[in-house]
Amino acid sequence: MKKKILILDDKTEFRRLTKTILSGKFEVESAENGMQGLALLQSGYMPDLIVTDLMMPVLGGKDFVEQVKSSGAFSHIPVIVLSSIDKSDEKIKLINLGANDYLEKPYNPAELLARIENLLKQK
């Protein structure tokens, strides 16, 4: 059975690209922002891993990570943050909030797959 990945990104082209890259190996669901992602989780959808953008409207990646990692029901789910922001202090904040990895956009598809597979092995 394929592992489930939830992708959060407000940019349709990035959601579509990431979904295309991952759908060969994983069952992929997507949402446009953190609020939609939380709604999916609260409705019973339980992914094996979450890939989220940092900058999104309504509920951004930082707040999404904080809510997921502070929730007993979802805190075990590994989270990879994707962002075009390359600031060490932002990466440190996200890791301190519980993000498991951080990858800059544009990303190398093979690197994203390798990071996902590595985190899923650790689970």
What are the language-model segments listed below?
Residues M56:
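Receiver (REC) domain active-site loop signature in two-component systems and cognate sites
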